[in-house]
Amino acid sequence: MSARVLMVQGCTSDAGKSTLVAALCRWLHRQGVAVAPFKPQNMALNSAVTVDGGEIGRAQAVQAQACGLPPHTDFNPVLLKPNSDTGAQVIVHGHPVATLDAVGYHAYKRTARTAVLASHARLVERFDVLLVEGAGSPAEINLREHDIANMGYAEAVDCAVILIADINRGGVFAHLVGTLALLSPSERARVAGFVINRFRGDLALLQPGLEWLERETGKPVLGVLPYLHGLQLDAEDALPRGPVHKPQARLRVVVPVLPRISNHTDLDALLAHPQVDVQLIGPGQSVPPCDLIVLPGSKSTRQDLAWLRAQGWEAAIARHLRYGGKLLGICGGLQMLGEQVHDPHGIEGAPGSSAGLGWLALQTALQPHKQLHRVGGRLLPSGAAVSGYEIHCGLSTGAALARPLLQLDDGRSDGAVSEDGQVMGTYLHGIFDHPAALAALLAWAGLADAAPLDLASLREATLERLADTVHAHLDIAALTRLTLGEPACAN
């Protein structure tokens, strides 16, 4: 077996590449096609743990779900997790290999390319179709040398490319024509057509522009996707844009948005719940009155802890607790709740130690070996089922661990609860995802009769909706030829 390969590249970041690939994955999966996702190189702080014990970008985990597959490290062989403005942890085939600045990674690209092509070779032998997501834009002139994320990959494996652009942000024709103009002749020949994303309005008013675009470029418009509201898909990086009005909200949750916040998909169930009002606060904002504060994960715990203090939020959180509010820390947030965070090996920056917030009697030492686990278990003492994953370098010890939050199915306990029950911490990402765990945690926070919410069912419904949208709005005959029929590089 040797799979047909189709790649989706975008004119910009957040053009809709991840969503279109997920939609196409589910569209093909519904037809019984053996399809798999692939992203050669991803940069994201939201990651997922795979069945083979590594980590990949969350978008590829969602795309795997759309294909009816468990996530695997081959679906995203190179993952970059930024830990500063100029550096990132480099994860290859699911495991960290180095922390490099931009210059260092540029030199490393040849090695990364070998890893990318090795994963590609394995996947094309296992599946009938490989749907590939590019990264950012293929027209970044300064990044073209040794490119493995966009056209460099497409040229290496000889695949066709769909170019997607977001009309909602404006300038869609300039984006498409400009991107095409900056490609080499051989790269332009790979572009099989355009998809315009997030359209609102009367399509008849757009039609003259589409006809001009096809005449100007000689490339077909494969379809115009509407702006879809209420999608329940794991985000790779972007947090929700603006507040969501919830007339039925009865529980107020505040989340400090840290500079290196990671795995904020932990908040998805709260954001989706009609009775929970989630307020994300950023620099310069005060902590408003609320029932629950959630300290999220962080790729740089000590640096984000210092930043939190600089905002004046430590005193605000202490005031929140004095008035009976609840506080939950997840992963890096758990580490911040302790008494000390030690980084003797310089895992997240310069070696050193930082005083924690001191609301849980524990200390954390960052270790070179990263813990990666997919786990299930139960909340204590309620017994509510939980499922999720661990991604952390920290090893926590201390008296607070004698009051664990979770009993895991593998025999370990996890997390800690303060003596007064106001403060909880856990290493488990996805702690709100299971309906029973969500109900129990909302009851602890003050919403005793919360309406049931099943996040997994919402995600499945979204994937079905995306597949329906593709079928209704894209050129299905052309997509069928590209994925199942004609030679890859037909002009």
Curated annotation (Swiss-Prot):
Pfam families (alphabetical): CbiA (PF01656), GATase_3 (PF07685)
GO biological process, one term: cobalamin biosynthetic process
Assigned keywords, A-Z: Cobalamin biosynthesis, Glutamine amidotransferase
Gene3D superfamilies: 3.40.50.880, P-loop containing nucleotide triphosphate hydrolases
Cited SUPFAM superfamilies: Class I glutamine amidotransferase-like, P-loop containing nucleoside triphosphate hydrolases
Database matches in InterPro entries: Class_I_gatase-like, CobQ/CobB/MinD/ParA_Nub-bd_dom, CobQ_GATase1, CobQ_N, CobQ_synth, GATase_3, P-loop_NTPase
Pathway the protein takes part in: Cofactor biosynthesis; adenosylcobalamin biosynthesis
Gene Ontology terms, MF aspect: ABC-type vitamin B12 transporter activity; catalytic activity
GATase cobBQ-type domain residues: 250-437
Catalytic residue list: 331 (nucleophile), 429
Function: Catalyzes amidations at positions B, D, E, and G on adenosylcobyrinic A,C-diamide. NH(2) groups are provided by glutamine, and one molecule of ATP is hydrogenolyzed for each amidation.
Family: Belongs to the CobB/CobQ family. CobQ subfamily.
HAMAP family per the UniProt record, alphabetical: CobQ
Protein name (record): Cobyric acid synthase
The gene coding this protein: cobQ
